[in-house]
Design a protein with these regions (language model features):
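N-terminal intrinsically disordered, cationic/polar leader segments
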Residues: 1-116
């Protein structure tokens, strides 16, 4: 995955801090150990600086994970890293809320904050 597949657009209100929340409730990837599909919801919350994420490109970016073997922890952090690289937000949190598997539920949260 790469932030180069993500399109952006200028923040229409760069002088103001405001929060954008995006949910991807049908996220899928593959367990790298078993090869079985993993299902979950990815929630992205961010305060933009000069750029915002274009949603159609974000949808296609998320689809790229569908057949990729990747751990929950890795995918959550990878999404955060790619989105931060694409838009350099003031702050961002990505939550991977994965479906129950083997009687266990996993939620992974990764955050980014600008220094200053």
């Amino acid at each position: 995955m790469s932030s180069s597949t993500l399109d952006t657009f200028p923040n229409p209100q760069p002088e103001r801090d405001y929060e954008i929340a995006i949910s991807c409730p049908e996220f899928t990837s593959v367990c790298p150990k078993t090869g079985l599909p993993d299902f979950g919801e990815i929630r992205i919350t961010y305060v933009p600086d000069t750029r915002c994420i274009e949603l159609k490109s974000l949808k296609y970016y998320m689809i790229e994970f569908r057949n990729r073997g990747i751990f929950y922890e890795t995918v959550t952090n990878q999404i955060l890293d790619d989105l931060v690289a694409a838009i350099q937000p003031r702050r961002m949190t990505v939550v991977g809320d994965f479906s129950v598997r083997g009687g266990l539920k996993t939620v992974v949260t990764a955050s980014y904050h600008t220094k200053g």
